[in-house]
C-alpha cells in the first residue's frame, strides 16, 4: 500500500468526487483531528463527564459531545462549498454559505457513553448535494442513495477514517507525527457469510418475532438449522461495531423493538443509518430495516429514526426474509 495522504488520495479519485467535495472532506478530517486531540487530553483538560444539558434526542450531553459538535460546525459553516449542515446534537440545521454545493450531516461523537470509561468513540458524516442556492430544511430530505460521500473516524488505539465516495471503501490511519491521514487499506470488501453478530441482547424481550427467531438460531449454533457456532460482539458505539464488520465481516442489528412503540427504531437515519449503509453497501454488504433498503427511505424529518440491520449480505438477507 502506497503512503498516500488523504489529500493525495482525493486528488486521484474521479467519478463524483469534485475538487470542491474533496475540500469539504478534508475540512471534516481536519476537524476530526481536533476532536482526536481533545479526546486524548480527556481528564487532563477537564473534558470528561456531563455538560449538564440534553440534546434534541433527549440524551445527556457529554462535554466532548459539545466540543466535537462545535469543532465541526465552526469549520463547516464558513466553508465556501457547504450550503448547510445538520448535527445530531442540534434541533435545526445550521446555514452555510450561499451557493455552497454540498450539505453535511454528522454525529459528532457516536458512542459518547464510552468516553468516561476510556473506550472507543467516533464521528460519522454524510455529504449530500445542495439543491438550492440558499438552503432550507427540506433540502436535506434526500434518500441515502443521493449521498456523494460518507464515512467515519474511529478514535481507538489508533485513529482511523473509513471513507466512500461511491467507488469502494478506503481506510486511512492518522499519523500523529505528520498530523495527516495516510491510506492504509483500499478496496475493503465484506464476506457474504459470517459467524459474528452485534446486538444489544438486553432488549430481547422487546424484539419482534422475526428478530427473536434469527437470534435464537444464532445462539443455538451447531445444534440449530444454521449448523455453525456464532460469536456475539457489542461495543455500544456504532462506529466501532461497523469498523469491526468492515475489517472482518459480521452483522450489526439495532432492530425495531416494542420498548417504545412510538419510535420506529433507535438510530438516526440521516446521521447514522444512511452513511453507514453507504459504506457497507460499497464494501459488498447489505443494509435494511428488516423490511426495506435503508438508503431507499425518503426522509421526512432531520432526526428521523429507523431500525438497522446491516453487514454481511447473506445474513442481512436471511433476517430480512424472516420479516
From Swiss-Prot:
Co-factor binding details: Binds 2 magnesium ions per subunit.
Compartments where located: Cytoplasm
Pathway: Carbohydrate biosynthesis; gluconeogenesis
Necessary cofactors: Mg(2+)
Recorded catalytic activity of this chain's protein: beta-D-fructose 1,6-bisphosphate + H2O = beta-D-fructose 6-phosphate + phosphate
Positions contributing to Mg(2+) 1 binding: 88, 107, 109
Presence of the UniProt keyword 4Fe-4S in the record: no
Pfam families reported for this sequence: FBPase, FBPase_C
Binding positions (Mg(2+) 2): 107, 110, 272
Source organism, top-level taxon: Bacteria
Residues annotated as signal peptide: none
Positions of substrate binding: 110-113, 200
GO molecular function: fructose 1,6-bisphosphate 1-phosphatase activity; magnesium ion binding
Keywords of this entry: Carbohydrate metabolism, Cytoplasm, Hydrolase, Magnesium, Metal-binding
Main subcellular location of this protein, as a coarse class: cytoplasm
CC per GO annotation: cytosol
Enzyme superclass (EC): hydrolase
Entry EC no(s): 3.1.3.11
Keyword Membrane: no
NCBIfam families from the UniProt entry: PRK09293.1-3, PRK09293.1-4
Recorded family membership: Belongs to the FBPase class 1 family.
Descriptive protein name: Fructose-1,6-bisphosphatase class 1
Source species of the chain: Acinetobacter baylyi (strain ATCC 33305 / BD413 / ADP1)
Encoding gene, per UniProt annotation: fbp
